[in-house]
Amino acid sequence: MKRLLLFAKNIAKYLPMFVLILFTLSACASRPYIKVNYQLPDKMPDKPAVTKIQLSVVDHRNNPDPLSITAREKLKDFHESYMLIMAPKGEDSPVEGIYDLKTLFEKVFRKRLDQMGIQVVDSTSLQIPKLEVAVTLFQLDLQDYKWYFKMGYEARLVKNGNILVKQTVSGQAERVDVPGIDDSGTTVSEVYADLINQLDIAALLGKLTPAQ
């Protein structure tokens, strides 16, 4: 009986440590995707100049690998996929899905256009304006126990085959790599959400004249 009580006391004593170890191992486990948190801008945009638009995302990165050598050593199971997480009020499940990079950009820009009351249409008509997003940089690095993320893209408003106006957006961030915690997604999300919302879509569409 005494041995049983001693065994129970030892379990109670070391249980928190065991739980912490299991949590740490679970947190350290590499995933096949990077979590990307995105929130639509709180400010409602002005009434758009158009109600329909085409949307195109192209990959113009010089380096198509989103991870540096050192970052890939940490994220060994990453398969070029991104879990898009959105948590607007009133929704139970914030996870939109897991996408490749191009689809990730398409999804969030569709959300922004939808928020503005603009319908994204699949059309070959030159009369319908097109928002073309060219991803130029998307790079996650890990150096000296810090995550570094850089991102850039160029948005162009195209109509009748002509580029009417364009806006270049870029930025970067860094975050300490805390042992036992995967901060890669947090580092990416901080820059990604900010830069997506930096694009002034209303201003781009404002370049369309009534005649166009």
PLM features per residue range, with description:
Residues 57-62, 134-139, 170-172:
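Generic short beta-strand segments
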Residues 30-40, 115-165, 174-176:
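Surface-exposed short loop/turn segments
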Residues 1-28:
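Sec-dependent bacterial lipoprotein signal peptides
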Residues 73-78, 150-155, 186-188:
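Short, low-complexity, polar/charged sequence segments that are solvent-exposed and flexible
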Residues 28-102, 204-212:
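A structural "domain/chain start" motif
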Residues 28-49, 114-117, 163-212:
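C-terminal/domain-edge helix-coil "capping" segments
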